[in-house]
């Protein structure tokens, strides 16, 4: 019975021929390590060798470095200070310096015991510098303002010793903190008054009167510019926008009533909103300036006061003036919504009413009658002055131009017997 697995049976076959291995391949050849080259023995140097052939002495090794600093001291203490820094001491020098300390300021660097070389020269340098600075200040305590007192004090005591002694600089100047003596002096008129110190005194500002004419006005009594006060009764965002714009008086024979009041584009094109009508109305009743002719056109330039109104007494509007505007010149295909977009930004706007009438001619376009209602006559006058000669489409040369006037009940037409039924 064959106990071999089926897998082993499938692998059965003719045995391969045995490999022929040469006997040399079993040998492992290990090369010996390379021996270092033997140095050639040099002949012994004789004492008769010339000194020029000897090696140069090695350079000095810097164990530490000290940043160069400037130490201010008296000439009599210079030798003592050098000996303290270099580590050399002398009892005779110490005694001579102590005897001369009665007539000159005492140097605390002599009190530092560094004669035995127990500390490094760098540490000795730092201790000595700190002691000298504290001693030089002495009783002259008070910061940067007292440096001059110390300087003049030493010049008065020893003028013969300090002739070649420069003025000490106790503060090392830098980029962010320059010394007090390196800064130029400030002229008295360098700073100017920005505002009044006392509100009641009213010190004048240093602002030219013509620089900010749109925001400041000149007081006639004291010549003090101040903010423009909004005293108008029609106070709204749109009215303030109108007041901020500059007023141009452009009289034109082709313009309708109240031309020249608002802001007119050059070349007789659309009439942009201007601040004048909102500013010329004193109260809700409204008024017109005396510069206007009976037909509503401007006669010239009027002098404005601090709030932009003419300096002359304005004429009030007629008492029976209507708060409804009659608008002519609308296209025949315009809608009520389009007309409302024109008048909605104005203060006091209520509604727009359109009446369409058929043309008398068969091929003619229908006529559109437009009536715009406002809260009062002053609001209606503001819109009238702003939209007079308004062009509906600037790109079209034959575009319609709006003609606005106050609406009134028309009387009997010529040739009619009675009134309108």
Swiss-Prot record:
Domain RRM: 323-409
Tissue: Isoform 1: Expressed in root meristems, lateral root primordia, root vascular tissues and cotyledon vascular tissues. Isoform 2: Expressed in root meristems, lateral root primordia and root vascular tissues.
Positions of region (Disordered): 1-64, 86-114, 197-226
Any one GO CC term of the record: nuclear speck
Comp. bias intervals (Pro residues): 33-44
Signal peptide: none
GO molecular function terms attached to this record: RNA binding
Main location: nucleus
Its biological purpose: Alternative splicing (AS) regulator that binds to specific mRNAs and modulates auxin effects on the transcriptome. Displaced from its targets upon binding to AS competitor long non-coding RNA (ASCO-RNA).
Name recorded for this polypeptide: Nuclear speckle RNA-binding protein B
Species for this entry: Arabidopsis thaliana
Name of the gene encoding the protein in the UniProt record: NSRB
